[in-house]
Amino acid sequence: MSTHTARPLGPQLALAGTVGKRVDVLVIGLTSASDGPEIALGDGIVDESVLTGLLDTLVAVGASGKAEETTRIPAPDTLPVDSVLAVGLGSAEKLDAEQIRKSAGAAARSLSGVGTVATTLSVLDLGAAAEGFALGAYRFNEFKSAKSAPGPDAQPVSRVELLVSSPRAKESKETLARSAAIAEAVATAREFVNTPPSHLFPAEFADRAKALGTDAGLKVEVLDEKALEKNGYGGILGVGKGSSRLPRLVRLSYSAKKRNAPKVALVGKGITFDTGGISIKPAAGMENMTSDMGGAAAVVATVVLAAKLGLPVDVTATVPMAENMPSSTAQRPGDVLTQYGGTTVEVINTDAEGRLVLADAIVRACEDDPDYLIDTATLTGAQMVALGNRTPGVMGTDEFRDRVAAISQEIGENAWAMPMPAELRSDLDSKVADLANVTNHRWGGMLAAALYLKEFVADGVQWAHIDVAGPAYNSSGPWGYTGRGGTGVPVRTMISVIEDIAANG
């Protein structure tokens, strides 16, 4: 049983029609242009003469409106706040929801030590502003003692008042509720990823996922190592053999209780720490492998979010959890294992373990006869070589792959559709088993991994595989609404795809 205690994962979000007296800082948007910056429209919430005075001061101190630039100035006596923060939105002609989200996040990150802020960014896009502030204010300091814990001046913003012309309108309330739920789900995924493997191992991860599912009213099933052995989950067991902390398989199911509701299966790789096993990784940077359960974190958060939003879609997450360690009991290069469902696999490289646990979970997920299946994983270093650290790769059945990629780009997670070249498939043939877990060369590694997974997807299922090896974890400096560590990608993509399925089938 987990002893983990949940904590607030972001600021309180509220609607407001005016700048209240308890507000410490007013955040406004500033667009850039060749003839100088302009304050983004505030829908009359702040008097135009006040905005004109603010713009003059901002120009005088060098504010340009460049995207995510922040400039803080003292507030005039006409505003009931201590200061005003202008955050750059970039070109007004190119302004979209994602830029508002990023700029809101940049504003939140710059306002450490501030209690309550109000913002007019919500006039431009309420949902994007709410998500950006909530995600930008996320912090993870759970393992800092009093010696190094942030003091009052470094605490994140605790309350954000989103200014709109009609704060009591049903549409505004619904938009804010949805955005707050999405931000909480992304933060939940981040929290899992950021928790070190000393404190988040398979059994603990399973317990915490179970608790989230139970609280959300989901059907929960947890298979321990004995149940995995009994049912033939050879991929999960093989990967977990080297660790004293034994594997799990978690199933979280949300039912829309609607006749003929579309069925969506989610599968996420849950390697709580990946040393590479016997095919051990280099020491440099291995600490970042705490993020190797980023796919699992995202699907757990997404199925809970689908339930909270009450979407008219049946969603089931199947989540394999294991720790990939080298030891005298670990699987070896050259071993043959049997995946759930009967396919035999020659393990050429024990560091290509993610596809082994995913294959078991995909076969199990397909037994539910889903209409759609999305799997996501920090699967291949080749994803980063091909697409960098911020662009997920999407492979799968052509139509659904393109649909997922397009939606991801619309909401700002920017996944890119990738092919699965048929000529690579024969490179996964084995001389001693049905398949090998890697090819005998380094070309197209991300694509070959997807081809491996394709072998386990049932005929007729619309399938998308999202490789987030780079995008799930930010090991460099913060940007936009993304701090260092877990990013929560691709939670927003998956929930948006599920919403699109609900609307359009």
Swiss-Prot record:
Establish whether keyword Metal-binding is in the entry.
yes
Q: Enumerate the Gene Ontology biological process terms.
A: proteolysis
GO-annotated cellular components:
cytoplasm
Its Gene Ontology molecular function terms? manganese ion binding; metalloaminopeptidase activity
> Which SUPFAM superfamilies does this one have?
Macro domain-like, Zn-dependent exopeptidases
The reactions it catalyses are: Release of an N-terminal amino acid, Xaa-|-Yaa-, in which Xaa is preferably Leu, but may be other amino acids including Pro although not Arg or Lys, and Yaa may be Pro. Amino acid amides and methyl esters are also readily hydrolyzed, but rates on arylamides are exceedingly low; Release of an N-terminal amino acid, preferentially leucine, but not glutamic or aspartic acids
Cofactor detail note: Binds 2 manganese ions per subunit.
State where Mn(2+) 1 binds. 274, 351, 353
By what name is this protein known?
A: Probable cytosol aminopeptidase
Species of origin reads Rhodococcus jostii (strain RHA1)
Lineage runs: Bacteria, Bacillati, Actinomycetota, Actinomycetes, Mycobacteriales
Question: What is the gene called?
Answer: pepA
